[in-house]
Amino acid sequence: MMFRLTSVGCILLVIAFLNLVGLTNACTSEGYSCSSDSNCCKNVCCWNVCESHCRHPGKRTRLQGFFKHRR
């Protein structure tokens, strides 16, 4: 009886530990919203969206975007 109680308690402890590890490693995938770099799996939060790397458009891209919005 004592062995059964100990093994059941051990199994429940392992299940609780695995659930805790699953909750603490949760991170946001690429393309989803974020509030800081630590929320993202790849640790890059650009403009409140998880990205593989931040893209900073150059002058030419900004100018083309400006003319598209004027039409």
UniProtKB/Swiss-Prot annotation:
Gene Ontology CC terms: extracellular region
Tissue: Expressed by the venom duct.
Entries under PROSITE patterns matching the protein: I_CONOTOXIN
Ribosomal protein is among the record's keywords: no
Annotated InterPro entries: Conotoxin-I_CS, Conotoxin_I2
Subcellular location as annotated: Secreted
Keyword annotations: Amidation, Cleavage on pair of basic residues, Disulfide bond, Neurotoxin, Secreted, Signal, Toxin
Keyword Lipoprotein assigned: no
Residues bearing the modification Proline amide: P57
Pfam families attached to this UniProt entry: Conotoxin_I2
Propeptide residues according to the Swiss-Prot or TrEMBL record: 61-71
SS bonds (residue pairs): C27-C41, C34-C46, C40-C50, C45-C54
Annotated signal sequence range: 1-26
Molecular-function GO terms, alphabetical: toxin activity
Other remarks on this protein: The mature protein is identical to the Conus imperialis toxin AC A0A125S9E2.
Domain writeup: The cysteine framework is XI (C-C-CC-CC-C-C).
Function (record text): Probable neurotoxin.
Family: Belongs to the conotoxin I2 superfamily.
Name of this protein: Conotoxin Lt11.3
Organism of derivation: Conus litteratus
